[in-house]
Curated annotation (Swiss-Prot):
Residues where xanthine binds: L20, N27, K156
Pathway as given in its UniProt record: Purine metabolism; XMP biosynthesis via salvage pathway; XMP from xanthine: step 1/1
Main location: cytoplasm
E.C. numbers: 2.4.2.22
Record-listed 5-phospho-alpha-D-ribose 1-diphosphate binding positions: A128, N129, G130, Q131, A132
Protein name, UniProt field: Xanthine phosphoribosyltransferase
Cell compartments where the protein resides: Cytoplasm
Reactions the enzyme catalyzes: XMP + diphosphate = xanthine + 5-phospho-alpha-D-ribose 1-diphosphate
Length: 191
């Protein structure tokens, strides 16, 4: 997605050869016009998948997931990372390891919002090692629902997440595929 790649080049900050900071438009401050374009792009790519639910993880996956849900006309469920007073019973749970934060957390969604008749699309902000996506897929499988694909805003193609998901048979659609962050420069996979 050209507009996203341009935004990464102009406003993204390479912190290391492994870490790209995009808090100017995605992870802290959110560019709503770009998010709307992202939602439309995900909707176009998955329009024939029969999606009934979009599943994401708090917090940075929520904005692109909401915009995709708006375009597709389907509800969005975000998995919580922390125990809540209002979300404590009848939960599907999975453990996920965050590459960026280097921590493991338990994510959860209520079993009242997803069931075996659902066709779910996973959407997340980044794909690195694939652990967040696999955790969300685990939650969907616990509900006996179908995973129709994984939509990623920014994929770090030099890390194993994409290959891991493809090997397990999942469709992966990434809007920006970063080939390298070497020498402080973002280069994209040529499609």
């Amino acid at each position: 997605m050209h507009a996203l790649e341009q935004k990464i080049l102009t406003e993204g900050i390479v912190l290391s050869d492994q870490v790209l900071k995009v808090d100017a438009f995605l992870n802290h401050q959110i560019d709503p016009v770009l998010m709307q374009q992202i939602g439309k792009e995900f909707a176009a790519r998955f329009k024939d998948a029969g999606i009934t639910k979009i599943i994401t993880i708090e917090a940075s996956g929520i904005a692109p997931a909401i915009m995709a849900g708006l375009e597709l006309g389907v509800p969005v469920i975000f998995a919580r990372k922390y125990q809540s007073l209002t979300l404590k019973d009848d939960l599907y749970r999975a453990k996920v390891f965050s590459f960026t934060k280097q921590t493991e957390s338990t994510i959860a969604i209520s079993n009242k919002h997803i069931n075996s008749s659902d066709k779910a699309l996973v959407i997340d902000d980044f794909l690195a090692n694939g652990q967040a996506a696999l955790g969300l897929i685990d939650l969907i499988h616990q509900a006996n629902a179908e995973v129709v694909g994984v939509g990623i805003v920014i994929e770090k193609s030099f890390q194993p997440g994409r290959d891991l998901l493809l090997e397990k048979g999942y469709r992966v659609e990434s809007l920006a595929r970063v080939q390298s962050l070497a020498d402080g420069t973002v280069t994209f996979v040529k499609e």
